[in-house]
Amino acid sequence: MIDPDGFRPNVGIVLMRQDGQVFWARRVRRDGWQFPQGGMNTDETPVEAMYRELREETGLLPEHVELLGATPGWLRYRLPSRAVRRNERQVCIGQKQVWFLLQFTGDESHLKLDHTDTPEFDHWRWVDFWYPVEHVVMFKRGVYARALRHLAPLAQSLAGPAAVGAMPQRALEAWLPGSSAAGHDSPRKRPRKRSGARAMRINND
């Protein structure tokens, strides 16, 4: 499913412990680390896609997490030109994502990376909240900075300001105009709207 602009609808997951540490995983047979993420099916809502991807990539079920909130609207990033398959009928130039913040309420024994026959990850660990912005592949740094910036107030309400902290300089540079990591809808290319500055809370009822 690719939109008319060439972006594939996708969900991203920030799984956080109560102490503010977030789940960080290594892709199978690759050196790259990232948050869980995945494409939406045509018949899914973003929330439904998020729970499916959570189960497929981490083995966790809805009872192992609490949904704290999500980014408002879509956040986009472009794929590097070498990764764009120009010979396909529908050309995908990037992803447009809704990012979710989940509190991990289960036990670490519930985390099973081999839940499916084709696992996405082969190793995981807990890292500081802003660590992923500095260590994810370069073309995703802008969208990671924007997603975590939106979700940080919710994370701080759970873990406390000291645990989550302020956005570090590296993350700030990914967000600022003119940064090579800023992504498709950086402030330089698409003006920020005041109403989109906060993460929205989601009712679990």
UniProtKB/Swiss-Prot annotation:
Q: What InterPro entries does the database record attribute to this sequence?
A: NUDIX_hydrolase-like_dom_sf (IPR015797), NUDIX_hydrolase_CS (IPR020084), NUDIX_hydrolase_dom (IPR000086), RppH (IPR022927)
User: What residue stretches are annotated with the Nudix hydrolase domain?
Assistant: 6-149
Name the coiled-coil region(s). none
Q: Determine if Chloroplast is one of this entry's keywords.
A: no
Q: Region labeled Disordered — which residues?
A: 178-205
Task: Indicate which residues form the motif Nudix box.
Answer: 38-59
Q: Give the required cofactors.
A: a divalent metal cation
Enzyme Commission number: 3.6.1.-
Fetch the CDD domains from UniProt. Answer: NUDIX_Ap4A_hydrolase_plant_like
Q: From the Swiss-Prot or TrEMBL record, what is one GO molecular function term? A: pyrophosphatase activity
Q: Which UniProt keywords apply?
A: Hydrolase
Q: What class of enzyme is it?
A: hydrolase
What is the name of the protein in this document?
RNA pyrophosphohydrolase
Organism listed in the record: Xanthomonas euvesicatoria pv. vesicatoria (strain 85-10) (Xanthomonas campestris pv. vesicatoria)
Please name the taxonomic classification of the source: Bacteria, Pseudomonadati, Pseudomonadota, Gammaproteobacteria, Lysobacterales
